[in-house]
Amino acid sequence: MSTKNRDRLVVTEDSDDDNEHEEMSSGDNSGEEGPSYGDAAARDPDETVAFPAPQRKKKKVIKKLTRKEQSLKHSVKEYRIKLAMVKPDITTDREKERNLRRIATKGVVQLFNAVSDRQKTMSDAVKEKMTARDRKEARERFDGKNFDSDKFADSGYGYGGKNEVKGEEEDEQMNIGDDEIDAGNYSDED
């Protein structure tokens, strides 16, 4: 094989433009699609192949914010705080959380008391000696579809008008009593 018919590539180290240092001689490959082992063996062993130096990665430039950008960022943060888009902090709102827990507990107690009273009246009505027709009417009367929420509120389970409006003195007295009760039964570790 002669060197005239083969392609030759010469690359020098630290080359910026690959086209400057490449030498291509076009020749007939005699139908071969790619280089073969014979071509590699026929090369001059003293021939050196140099590769270009790897390009260095650019360091990320940390952009320092201008005063205008800083003030804009601060105003956006304040706006989010105004919109209550901040996670609640239990340590600062401990009193508020305790009041909400107490209200929820009262609501659940009222609900269970109402359910037990309803079950009691229903079982009393069913225990009476009745005809089949009277039992059917009693079941329809105690059906959930016929439940009267006004009657529920009047029976003392719902919130009345006088419970919603409280004086500050009455509220303070209630907080003192709740603290004494809660101290023995509950812990704030949940």
Curated annotation (Swiss-Prot):
Q: Which domain of life is it from?
A: Eukaryota
Coiled-coil stretches noted in the UniProt entry, renumbered to this chain: 59-84
Mark out the compositionally biased spans (Basic and acidic residues).
Answer: 1-11, 119-153
GO BP annotations, alphabetical order: maturation of 5.8S rRNA; maturation of LSU-rRNA
By its UniProt entry, which Pfam families does this protein fall under?
A: Rrp15p
**Bias-annotated ranges (Acidic residues):** 167-190
Q: Which InterPro entries match?
A: Rrp15
Please note every region of biased composition (Basic residues).
55-66
One GO cellular-component annotation of the UniProt record comes to: preribosome, large subunit precursor
Q: Which keywords, in A-to-Z order, does the entry hold? A: Coiled coil
The UniProt annotation puts the region (Disordered) at 1-69, 119-190
- Family per record: Belongs to the RRP15 family.
* Protein name stated in the entry: RRP15-like protein
Organism listed in the record: Caenorhabditis briggsae
